[in-house]
Amino acid sequence: MLYWLLYEKAFLLHNFTPFRIFRYLTFRTAFASLTALFMGLIIGPAVVRRLREFQIGQYIREEGPKSHQKKSGTPTMGGVLITIAIIVPTLLWADLSNKFVWIAMLATIAFGAIGFTDDYLKVANRRNLGLTARAKMGLQILVAILVAISLVLVQRHGHYNTHLIVPFIKSFHPDLEISKLATYPHIWIIAYIPFLAFVAIVLVGSSNAVNLTDGLDGLAIGCTVIAAGALTVLTYVSGHAQFADYLGLSRMPEVGELSIFCGAMVGSAIGFLWYNAHPAEVFMGDVGSLALGGAIGTVAVIIKQELLLPFIGGVFVLEALSVILQVGSYKLRKKRIFKMAPLHHHFELLGWSESKIIVRFWIASLVFALFALTTLKLR
């Protein structure tokens, strides 16, 4: 909105030179991040106070670590603040004629809405019973497929492609489109079934991985700051012709605007961390974790870095993998691999303090993200 008012109107139409700075992506990304940060810091106390007034408190599972019982009643659904602090700065600073920006924002809102419904039912029932696992998964798959269809429609207008970029293999770009079917006017969507399925796996996986990581004060949101920061770099270089050519990335000029969305995600996450740091004053709830996971996954799909996402969000992947291994091992062998899953609970039961686990997982997340960025030059 500010981009449209101050650059396209004030500068391009009336040649008001000071507003020329709004054409620069780095400037708008930085200010989107700052806007999101200060929105979180300023609005945060009012949100926490209102959540307390409405008695929207977190229900703690009895089978979880005993040390968590003291957190019962801590305000939850703070993810509403995160989502607002991402969307509003993006609307202010991004070029709203960009299709990818809208896809990312709407995906974030949609995944957040699923989480909001789940949180609301838990609070209303005064128990840890929200949406059924089947309903939750079904809604996530639906949103993911809608995101994929949106990208297919963009692709059919020549602004996107369904190829995979494989890390470390520069010349191998498999296409997830069945090209022979894509030319048929009435059944063309069938040609994109592999792409739809792949996007569904990425988005459902990323949203649930962040959700599983959100078990300790500041853990998930701190890892999100790092992952979103890495995505900010990737979106910028993917949209910059010279950087993209130098690093061997797909040149996609329009995805550069997503760096504003990612910058807003970084600022929003830091602002929320101010109140979510141990001991937490508020929890993000599913409304926050699903929105953030959906946003991260959507951006990765748009910029063709889906296969790099497991490194960008390495801690999220380890947390999700620990649950899969634990459940699989117990069903097949009646034995548990970890003392408790997700992984952070395992370390709690080993005697690590909550603060130590959080900081060490942040460090691991930073190492993963830096490794992901270094792979750009290893292709």
From Swiss-Prot:
Its main location: membrane. One of its GO terms (biological process) is cell division. It comes from the Bacteria. Pathway: Cell wall biogenesis; peptidoglycan biosynthesis. Keywords: Cell cycle, Cell division, Cell inner membrane, Cell membrane, Cell shape, Cell wall biogenesis/degradation, Magnesium, Membrane, Metal-binding, Peptidoglycan synthesis, Transferase, Transmembrane, Transmembrane helix. Its cofactor is Mg(2+). GO terms for molecular function: metal ion binding; phospho-N-acetylmuramoyl-pentapeptide-transferase activity; UDP-N-acetylmuramoyl-L-alanyl-D-glutamyl-meso-2,6-diaminopimelyl-D-alanyl-D-alanine:undecaprenyl-phosphate transferase activity. It is a multi-pass membrane protein. NCBIfam families: mraY. This is Phospho-N-acetylmuramoyl-pentapeptide-transferase. It comes from Koribacter versatilis (strain Ellin345). The gene is mraY.
